[in-house]
Structures are given as structure tokens and as C-alpha cells.
């Protein structure tokens, strides 16, 4: 748990201060104050604190403190810490009518909600058949570390764990579903894929009987800054979360280079928080990314820092994407309805553990997936402002849904399958990870990758290539997840 020490009003920058591993942070308040800052949160189990300061030399002064191994400003966008009051606007805005696509008959492969005929992704990984065995257990809790979730959505409300939900955007946990309300849409989409209820409304999630907590780390603009990521994993560890879904990379650096002092501090703090969660039995599942980068052989980062003007720089394997490249994290690449790798999905022989449906609007449009994307829940209040008109779907009940694509959509399928496994076996942590990677259908590297020539890596422009064997390769890992195998 974090302790909130001050409101830090008027501060211009947020800082992570990383003490040497297992060093006491009991003197952090005095040290931060002496350096011209205010202590915002203390994460004693991992020897990390969050501070705010307007002093230009704050980081330099903190690095000189005995026991401190790193201090770094995490963003130029200071996030307000206001003593616990986090505003949320859940009011409807605008007209949500749309020319929705025609809906095939429901009841496809055992999925029986009103929009189930549009769920090609669930059919592909045999979710309906799996539900004949188990729909998950309400004793299993998935923490969706994302932009929050719309706890009022009728397809999510039955399964939301209000007490385990939290807003971590500022680096200080503010508990409750109101604080965790989604102001972007992304988190509501991933939450629906994991745990939308089988209630006759809209769609069905992979594990519609488990509980889900909205752990809000991403702000309205979709940034996931280090203090929020640290807070989120510490919260998950201490609040009974079994599986976390992580459909993001931690900003502002796509690749955090451990040979750079500032980026090393960010990597260290985030890695410690993830490791702490893993030590409590939490399985961490994460998206590989949408840059078509080979994460096992990185050479260029043209994306970072993304909170200002990116600067192209040469990188190596000393640089890693958080959270997907943190040891023990299950990395997920994306597939489309033809069970090919999605054109945008990043990959890597040492990085991808499993593949899951994320959609592909260019190479993999089919009769079942006419626009190639994945349908899931969306806040009605944000539908007209954050979901393009052609992607909007309104259920007969008035509930809102949106089509999206990305490894962000793939990861929650894997997290949901992990939740099913946990429900039927009681497995946690490493044992759960191994079981998830066994519940797959292997997909070999394609013999011809020319279809991907139009979309080289966004970082460096390298052509996409696949390496490895049938049972472990850089595009699909062990294979595409299979929910029926998971519960069989």
C-alpha cells in the first residue's frame, strides 16, 4: 500500500525516487523536503517514493541522498494530487445513434447475447465451448490496468469489484469505482473482452463470471506514466488480484534503456513493482505493442519520448518495453480472423509467449469479421467523441459498443483465458502462466511474409520477419490461445 503524505498543489513535475533495493524509505519525507519537494506516496516494499517539486535541481539533489540510486522526472504533464477527490464525468454527450452493421443470428458457438454473432474473436478461440465447462468463478479477480472502466455499463456492472477498483494516475491510490471511471474508452473495451456478463445484453466476455477491478493508470489522453504504473501494480498486489491485463506501454519511453541513468530509474521502479505483484501470486499479462517492431532485436526507437517531440535514437537489447519485456510477464501478440499475425503487431522470439485475437482491418477482413476489428464495451458518454461512426454499435438495450484493433485487444483475451484457468484449477503466478502457454494451438511461421511488406517496423523501418519453430516462434509464441483447452 502507498501512504499519501502531501497534496503537492502547485508542483510542476512528478518524480520517482528509487532507493537501493531493500533500503528503508523512512527518512524519505525529510530528504525530499530538504531537496525542495513534497513527498506524495511511499512504496516501502520496493524502496520507491513518488515526489513533486518545482525545483529544477530536485533530481540532482535527491541523487546525492544516501541510499538513493536514482531520481527522475516522469512527465512534463504534472498530474494533480488533490487529497483524494478525483472528478469523473459520466454524463451522456451527444447523439449515440449509428448505422450499426447487421448482426448475424446470435447463439454462435454457445455465445447467446444480442451481439454475440459479431464476436468472431470469441468463436475463434472457442470461448462458447469453454463456457459449457466454466464461465469463471467470482472468487477470481482480474485487475484491468488501463484507463479505468465504465462501471455503469450494463455489460460490466454485474462483475465490477468496486472495492478493488482504484485511480492511480497521480501515483497515489484513490479507491473506488467513481475514481476509476473511464474517461478514454480504451479501458472499458479491454474490460469487456475479459469479463462482459452473459446477461442477454450486447456481448459476452471470455470469463463472464469472474470479477474485474478497474485499475486506472492511463489518463484521458491515454498516457501511462511511471508513477501510475508503479501505483497500479502495488495496488494489485495488495488487493487480491489474480491476473492483471496490461494493454499499454509505460510512457514516456517506449524503450527504457538501462544504460541511461534516468531511464534505468524508471525501469527499476516499474520492474520492482511488477516483481512485487508477482511475488503475491499475480499473473501479469501484457500487449506486445503496435509498432511491428522485433522486440528481440531492437535497433532504433523513433517513438520516444512521447510526451514531447520524439527523438530518433539507436538502441540495443539494453533497452526494454515495460511491462511486456519484464521477466515473468506473459507477452501477447495479435492475430486476425485468418489466424495470421496482425499487420501491426510487434513480436520477438524471446518476447511473445502467446497470441490472441486483436483484429486486422487490412489483411484479415472476412465474412465473420467484415471490418477486421474486435467489438467490445464502450462508455455511452464517450461513444460519439472517441469511437468513429463506422465502428459504433448500439445494443437494443441502449448499451454502447465499439470496434477496435490492436495488441491492446489481444492481451485481454489472454488475461480472460488465464482467469478461466485460475477458476477451474486454482493455479496462480508461474503455474498459471505455464498453464496458459499450454492452452494454445500452435501456428507456424509463414513461408511467405510478403503480405507484410507494406508495414515495416515503425521504429527503424525494418521488414517484418518470423523466426523459430512450430511450438515457439517470434510471431505467435507457443500458439494462439484456446479457451476450451484451458478448461478441459
Regions found by a protein language model. Give the residues of each.
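C-terminal subdomain of the subtilisin-like protease fold in secreted/lumenal serine endopeptidases
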Residues: 39-41, 204, 240-248, 400-401, ...
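Structural recognition of the beta-strand scaffold that forms the well-ordered cores
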Residues: 16-17, 40-41, 49-50, 141-145, ...
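Short, surface-exposed ligand-recognition loops at beta-strand->loop->(often short) alpha-helix junctions
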Residues: 16-24
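Active-site core segment of subtilase-fold serine proteases
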Residues: 95, 100-211, 218, 223, ...
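Autoinhibitory propeptides
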Residues: 8, 29-116, 337-338
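Secretory targeting and sorting signals
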Residues: 1-3
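Extracellular S/T/G-rich loop segment that most often corresponds to the catalytic His/Ser-adjacent loop
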Residues: 146, 282, 309-420, 480-485
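Catalytic-core regions built around general acid/base machinery
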Residues: 262-283, 318-328
